[in-house]
Design a protein with these regions (language model features):
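N-terminal signal peptide c-region/cleavage motif recognized by signal peptidases
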Residues: 19-21
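Caspase-like (clan CD) cysteine peptidase catalytic core
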Residues: 26, 64, 76-99, 104-164
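Bacterial N-terminal signal peptides that target proteins for export
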Residues: 1-11
Length: 180
C-alpha cells in the first residue's frame, strides 16, 4: 500500500518534471527516515518509507542522499548541507526533501521530531524539535528551479502526556509560488 501511495505521489511530480531529465537540470533529493526514537514511541515504517522513496527517486533520475535516525543537530546539519549542494548545482536544480517520522504542530507551528528529543514539559518541544519553517527558509535560500518538500509525518502526538496544545497532524503550510 505504501508503494502505491508513494507511486501516486511521484507520478504527478514525474509528469511535472518531464519524463526525461533536461540536460541542464540537476535533480537532488534528501530522504530522511526517523524510526529509532529514544524517548517517544519508535516508528517502524519511516525507515521502510525512506528506503522505498530513495529507490523510486533514484529510478526517477535523482541523486539521492539518504539519512536515518538523526539527532536535532544532525537533522539541522543535513538540511544545511543539502541546501549547500543545491546552491552549488545552480539555479536549474530540482531539489526534493522527503521526511518520514514524527511531526506535530503546536499553536499552528509545525515541527519535525529528531530521535533525541526528550522534553520534560511542553515548552521544551519547540526547543528540542526542528521547526518546519526553519527548514523551508534554508531550502529557499538556495537558488533552484523547483523545490519539493514531502512529509510523511505520524499524526499522533508523541507528547500527549505533557502537551495538550499539540494538534493532530501538521498545520497548513502556505508556500509562496515563485519564492526565491
Amino acid at each position: 500500500m505504501l508503494r502505491r501511495t508513494l507511486f501516486n505521489l511521484l507520478v504527478p511530480a514525474t509528469l511535472l518534471l518531464g519524463l526525461a531529465p533536461a540536460l541542464a537540470e540537476s535533480r537532488l533529493a534528501l530522504v530522511i527516515g526517523q524510526s529509532a526514537y529514544k524517548s517517544v514511541p519508535a516508528l517502524p515504517n519511516p525507515a521502510n518509507d525512506a528506503k522505498a522513496m530513495s529507490q523510486l527517486l533514484t529510478e526517477s533520475g535523482f541523486a539521492v542522499t539518504a539519512a536515518s535516525d538523526l539527532s536535532q543537530a544532525q537533522l539541522r546539519d543535513k538540511i544545511s548541507e543539502f541546501a549547500g549542494q543545491v546552491a552549488a548545482k545552480g539555479a536549474d536544480t530540482v531539489a526534493l526533501v522527503f521526511y518520514a517520522g514524527h511531526g506535530l504542530q503546536i499553536d499552528g507551528e509545525n515541527y519535525l521530531v529528531p530521535i533525541d528529543v526528550d522534553p520534560k514539559r511542553e515548552a521544551d518541544i519547540p526547543i528540542q524539535a526542528v521547526r518546519l519553517n526553519d527548514i523551508l527558509n534554508t531550502l529557499t535560500s538556495a537558488p533552484s528551479r523547483l523545490r519539493i518538500l514531502m512529509l510523511a509525518a505520524c499524526r499522533n502526538n508523541p507528547f500527549g502526556d505533557i502537551s495538550k496544545s499539540a494538534g493532530g497532524g501538521l498545520a497548513l503550510v502556505d508556500a509562496t509560488f515563485g519564492a526565491p
